[in-house]
Amino acid sequence: MNADAQSTDASLSMREPLSHASIQEMLRRVVEKQAADDTTAIGKVFSEAGRAYAQDALPSDKGEVLKISFSLDATQQNILRANFPGRRTVFSNSSSSSHCFAAAHRLLETDFVYRCFGNTVDSIIDLGGNFVSHMKVKRHNVHCCCPILDARDGARLTERILSLKSYVRKHPEIVGEADYCMDTFQKCSRRADYAFAIHSTSDLDVGELACSLDQKGVMKFICTMMVDADMLIHNEGEIPNFNVRWEIDRKKDLIHFDFIDEPNLGYSHRFSLLKHYLTYNAVDLGHAAYRIERKQDFGGVMVIDLTYSLGFVPKMPHSNGRSCAWYNRVKGQMVVHTVNEGYYHHSYQTAVRRKVLVDKKVLTRVTEVAFRQFRPNADAHSAIQSIATMLSSSTNHTIIGGVTLISGKPLSPDDYIPVATTIYYRVKKLYNAIPEMLSLLDKGERLSTDAVLKGSEGPMWYSGPTFLSALDKVNVPGDFVAKALLSLPKRDLKSLFSRSATSHSERTPVRDESPIRCTDGVFYPIRMLLKCLGSDKFESVTITDPRSNTETTVDLYQSFQKKIETVFSFILGKIDGPSPLISDPVYFQSLEDVYYAEWHQGNAIDASNYARTLLDDIRKQKEESLKAKAKEVEDAQKLNRAILQVHAYLEAHPDGGKIEGLGLSSQFIAKIPELAIPTPKPLPEFEKNAETGEILRINPHSDAILEAIDYLKSTSANSIITLNKLGDHCQWTTKGLDVVWAGDDKRRAFIPKKNTWVGPTARSYPLAKYERAMSKDGYVTLRWDGEVLDANCVRSLSQYEIVFVDQSCVFASAEAIIPSLEKALGLEAHFSVTIVDGVAGCGKTTNIKQIARSSGRDVDLILTSNRSSADELKETIDCSPLTKLHYIRTCDSYLMSASAVKAQRLIFDECFLQHAGLVYAAATLAGCSEVIGFGDTEQIPFVSRNPSFVFRHHKLTGKVERKLITWRSPADATYCLEKYFYKNKKPVKTNSRVLRSIEVVPINSPVSVERNTNALYLCHTQAEKAVLKAQTHLKGCDNIFTTHEAQGKTFDNVYFCRLTRTSTSLATGRDPINGPCNGLVALSRHKKTFKYFTIAHDSDDVIYNACRDAGNTDDSILARSYNHNF
C-alpha cells in the first residue's frame, strides 16, 4: 500500500504545472455553474446584482424605496408615514433646512399623485413641477410647464437647471434631456389624458383651469394645495406640522402664507380664487363639465380632483351635494354678537357690534351654569367675572393629574369679557321673562317675540352699567337673522366670520351693517329724510365719554323697513316661541344657519363664457393659420406657373437666347426642392374606368388581392403613426427617451449631431441596416458605409435633432409590393390551384425537386414565403445560376421585381405562411395556368402584424391532396403529433426507424441549457431567444430561432427551451384560432433527438404533457406509428 502511495506521489510530481489560461478556464466553468444557484455565494452575488440592475432599469413604482434627504425628527417621520402609508421611504437626514417637513411632504405628494394615475408610459403634464426630481426617479413620461411669472420663478428655474447639470455630470449614462417648457399651462402645446399640480394652482381660477384642461383633452387632473377649511370662517390661523401661518386680508382679497422660521419664503394668493377650490363642486363649461372632489386632507394640504364628465350635455344637473371640506368645521360653531369698550369714535358716535365664534358645546355648558348661578340681586361685575373664568377654563389647556388636556376650542383672551357680558345679558333676560311666561301659560296664550323682546334699540359699547342698560333697549324682530343676512351683499360674509375685529384702528370709523341706524346732529339732513320715510325717533340717550368727560346726546331711530318686517312676520305667523338656552335671534346664531342664509349660491361655477371666449380664440388662430397656409400654396402655385411659362417660352424660341433676369439653373432648382416639377410616374399596365378612374377588377381573385392591399396599407400606416407618436411624445428632441422603448425594445433613435444611436440599454447599436428613418418631416433615407452611417447621410440628417427607427424601417416592402398587387387586379387570371396538404416531414421539398422543371422553355416559377426556404431550394434543385436568380425566389422579391418573369406553372412552398392575395397576384403576373401549393394547414399560418385587421380571404383555396406519412419524425414524436397536435390529419405514420428520441430536462436557469453547435435551439418568443443568445456558453451556436422562424427547417438534434414560468397560449396550445400550431412545429423539426429544457413544471404545457406521455408509453404502442408498408 505504501508502494502505491509512493507511485501516486511520483505521478503527481511528474504532472506539468497548471497554466494561467487553464486556471482561468476552470474559474469560468465554476462561476457559470454556480451563478444559476442562488444558494451559493457566487449565485447570491449575481442574484443581487441582477435585481439591482432590473430595478434601476424600471420606472418608479410603489414598491420602490423613495429616498428623502431632508432632516426630520421622529415625530415628523411618523406623520409622513401616516399620511402616505403605501410608500416605502428611507430618511437619510443628510440635508438641513428650516422647512424640511414641508419640502419632504411635497416630494411625497408628487409621488402619491403620480401613482394615482397608474401610468408610466402615456404623457402626463405637471403644472410648475420640478423636472429634475422627475428625471431622478425615472418619471420620463412627465412634461413640466415652468412659466416665468416673476423673478422668483426665474430664480427657481436657475436652481433647477444647475441641479440638472450637476446630476447629469454625475450620471454620464443618461442620454435623454429633461422634459419641460417655459410656457404657462394655458399656452403649452402638449396634450395628455392626465395632468397634476403640486402647490401651483392657488392663483389659477378653477374655471380657467377647467377650460385649459378641456382644450388639452385632460380627463383626470389632481392637484394639492395648502388650504384649510378654517379659512372660510377665520381671518388667520396656523398649520402646525408645516410651521406655516396664514392671514387673510379680505379688503384686498389676499391670503398671505408665511413660514414661521423662514421669513423669505412667504407668498400671497388671491383668496377669492383659492376659496373656489374649497366651495365649488363642479365646473360647467357649457359643452362640457368637470367634477371637483376634495379627496384627502393631510392636515393643511388638501388633494383636489377634477374629473372630466363623459356624456355631459348642456343643462344637465351636476348633483353637487354637500362639500365635506368645510361642513364639519361650520357645524359646531356659534356666532356670538358682542360689544367692546373702545368701539366708540368721538366724532361720529358710531357703535359697532362684533361677532365672535364660540364652540357650541362650550357656549351651551357655560350658559347653563351661568343660569343656575344667576342671582337677581348680585353685582353684574362679579357675575361677568365668574362667566369669563368659566370660558377660560373651558377653552384652554387644563392640567389634570399631570396630563395636559385641551378643553374645547381655544378662545382669544380678548374675547372673554365681551362674550361673558353677552352671556350674562342673555341669562338675565331669560330670568326676567319667567314671570311673564308663567302668566301666559296660565292664560293659555302664545308668547310673541315682541312681548319677550320688548324694549328699544340703543348704542352698544362697554362702559360699566351703561352697557347693560343699552343692551336692554335693543328690540329686533324674530326673523332678523335671515332677513338681515340675506339683505347683505355676499362680500359681507367675510366680516361675519371675523375673529380679528379688535384690530380696527380708532381712526377708521366702523359702521354696523345691521338695520339699526345711530345718527347725531352731524347727520341732521339724513335724519330728516329718514323721518319723512316713516322712521320715528323713539328715544334720546345721553352718553358720557370717560376719556374726555364730555356728554353727547344721541337720537335713536327705528327704521321703516323694520316696521314692515315686523308686520309681515305677524301676518305670516312668523312669531318665535320660547327660545332654547343658546338659540337667541339676536346674540346667539348657529354658524351653519348663517352659512345657508348668506351664501345663497350654487355649488357649480359657470365658466361657459370663458370657455366660449377661449374656443373663439382657438378658432381664430386656426383660421389665421389656414389662411396663411392657403396663401403659401397660392404663392407657390403662382411661382410654378411663372416658371412653366418661362420654360415654354424658351422651348418655343430655342435660338432666341435667354431672357435677361429669368434664367434658372439646375443648381438653383436643386437648392429649392419646392420649385422642382415632379416627373410623372408611368401608369401601370392595367385598364381603368374611363369615368371614375378606378381600376377595373377583372381578376377573379380580386377579393383576396384587395384584402392584401388593405392589410399592407394598414401595417404601413400603423408604422408611421407609431413612429410619429414617439416623436411627438419626445417633441422630436431627446426628452423622455426612456419611455420610447417601453412598448418595443427593438426601437432605436439616432442623434445626428452626436452621431450616436440610442436604445433601451446604455450602449445600444442598430439591429440592422435600416433603409429609412422617421423624422419630424416624414421618412428620410439612410445610407450606410459598412456598419455605420455614411458621413454625407449624417451631415444631411443634422437638420434634425433626432430620428426614430423600428423593424418596419429595415425594408419598406409594403410600399414596393402594393403597385404589383394593384396591377394584378386589372389582369385576367386563368389558373387552377392544387394544394398538397402534408404533415411535417412528408417530403414536400423532395417532391418539389422531383416535379420542378428547371430547364427548357417551360421553366417553373418556384416561390417561397421566406428567404431560408428559397436558399434551401436553390441548393436542392439542380439548374443554372441565372435560373436560380430569376425563377427561385421569395414571393415578396418577385412582386417587387420591375420585370417579372413568365411561367406556365407556379410552385409555392409553405403557401400557408403567405397571404393568399399575394399568391394569386404572383400567379396572375406570371401568366400561370397552374398553381401547386405545398404546406401544412395545421402548422403556423399567416400571422398578421396588425391585430385589429380582420381577415376573410387570407387562406389559399383549391383542390386538396393530403400526405399523412412523415420521413423525418421518429416514432415517439409521430405518436405525440397524432395524439396532441394533428386534429384533421389521421392516422399519421412515419418511415423513420428511430423509436425513441424525446427527453425532458428540468433546469433552474438558462445557464443549464446544454451546448451543441450542431443542434437547432428553439423557443416560443423573441424574449426567450434573446436570453439564449446572451448566454456565454452558447456562443458559436448560430441556430437559435423561434418556432415561427423555424417552420420548414430540419435538424438531427433539436433543443427546445422554455425559460419562463408564465403560462401563455403558445405553451398551452389553446389559442382560439391557431391552436397548438407552435408546439407542432417545435416537435416536428428533429430526426434523431429532441430535448425539452424547461424551467416550469406546467401541467398545461402541451409539449411537456406530450413528452411525458411518450416517455411513459410502452415501446409496442409507439411502434404502431411506423409505416409498415415501407
Curated annotation (Swiss-Prot):
Residues 834-1094 are annotated as: ATP-dependent helicase. One of its GO terms (molecular function) is ATP binding. Its EC number is 3.6.4.-, 2.1.1.-. It is found in: Host endoplasmic reticulum membrane. Residues 69-406 are annotated as: Methyltransferase. Residues 964-1125 form the (+)RNA virus helicase C-terminal domain. ATP binds at residues 838-845. This is Replication protein 1a. It comes from Alfalfa mosaic virus (AMV).
